[in-house]
A protein has these predicted regions:
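Short beta-strand-to-loop elements that line the ligand-binding cleft
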Residues: 15-16, 31-41
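Short helix-loop capping/hinge motifs at secondary-structure junctions, enriched
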Residues: 1-4, 34, 95-101
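A ligand-binding cleft/hinge motif common to bilobed small-molecule-binding domains
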Residues: 53-73
């Protein structure tokens, strides 16, 4: 409950998987990171090798349920939410321009007709509702890993908890 800002968050260490891109992101924001194999992170949290194990909205509830028998003392914090832009990209061979154009055209049509959002909410809505954003303090972290061409200004491409 005492974590209100990024400066407050920097007083804690986070656990992350070896080689995860999030490691660089947290370190670039001045947050101490302990890396380990994913399968060891829950046990390491139990033994206080680090303070926090940030998980994505699409991961936290499933993992919590799966790991709760082995880690009964673990809780999901209900006060804060760490947020940073994290895109998912489609990569295609530069030799397949037809596929590139077809994917881009299809995604643009989906954004325009609302089917992109419908699919997003179909697969993520339950977890997003369970997070209960209105009762959480959102701590924004910069994602310095993003290419300069990342369309951060195109709000229809991003989910942001403040817009929820």
């Amino acid at each position: 409950k005492n974590v209100r800002t990024l400066a407050d968050l920097k007083k804690f260490s986070v656990g992350q998987g070896v080689g995860w891109d999030d490691v660089k992101l947290y370190e670039a924001n001045g947050i101490s990171v302990v890396e380990a194999k994913y399968s060891n992170l829950f046990r390491m949290l139990h033994y206080q090798r680090f303070d926090l194990f940030p998980r994505g909205i699409n991961e936290i509830f499933t993992e919590f349920e799966k790991e709760s028998a082995q880690n009964p003392d673990r809780v999901i914090d209900e006060n804060i939410l760490i947020h940073y832009p994290w895109p998912y990209y489609f990569f295609v061979s530069k030799n397949n321009q037809a596929l590139h154009k077809r994917l881009e055209s299809g995604l643009k049509k989906m954004l325009k007709d609302g089917s992109f959002d419908a699919i997003f909410w179909k697969y993520n809505g339950k977890a997003i509702e369970a997070v209960n954003f209105k009762n959480r303090r959102i701590i924004e972290i910069q994602n310095y890993l993003l290419p300069k061409a990342t369309p951060l200004h195109h709000s229809s491409l991003w989910f942001h908890p403040k817009m929820k």
